[in-house]
C-alpha cells in the first residue's frame, strides 16, 4: 500500500480516518461526510484504489484493505501516545 497517498488524503480530510475502515463505504456517504462533489470523490477513490488502500465493492463503494486497517490502527495508537 502506498502510504504517501493515504497520508495526503488523511491530512487534507481528517474525517476520513473516522470511517475509512468501517466496512463497506459508499461514495455518496463519503462525499456527504467530507462535503465534496461527486467527481472529486471519485478521483479520490481512484487514488485509493491505485494506492492499494481500498478494494472496490460494487461500482459505488469500497472496503479498506488489511494494510489500510493496520495503518490506521498504527496512526491512532501513535496519536494516542502523543507520537
Where are these regions (language model features)?
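Short amphipathic alpha-helical interaction segments
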Residues: 36-47
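Short, cationic-aromatic polyanion-contact patches
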Residues: 3-10, 59-80
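Short amphipathic alpha-helical interface segments
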Residues: 2-32
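Short stretches within intrinsically disordered, low-complexity N-terminal or propeptide regions
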Residues: 24, 32, 53-55, 66, ...
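A short, conserved structural fragment
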Residues: 49-59
Amino acid at each position: 500500500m502506498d502510504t504517501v497517498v493515504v497520508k495526503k488524503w488523511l491530512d487534507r480530510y481528517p474525517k476520513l480516518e473516522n470511517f475509512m475502515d468501517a466496512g463497506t463505504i459508499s461514495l455518496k456517504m463519503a462525499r456527504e461526510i467530507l462535503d465534496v462533489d461527486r467527481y472529486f470523490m471519485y478521483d479520490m477513490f481512484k487514488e485509493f484504489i491505485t494506492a492499494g488502500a481500498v478494494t472496490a465493492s460494487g461500482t459505488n463503494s469500497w472496503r479498506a484493505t488489511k494494510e489500510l486497517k493496520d495503518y490506521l490502527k498504527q496512526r491512532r495508537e501513535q496519536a494516542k501516545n502523543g507520537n
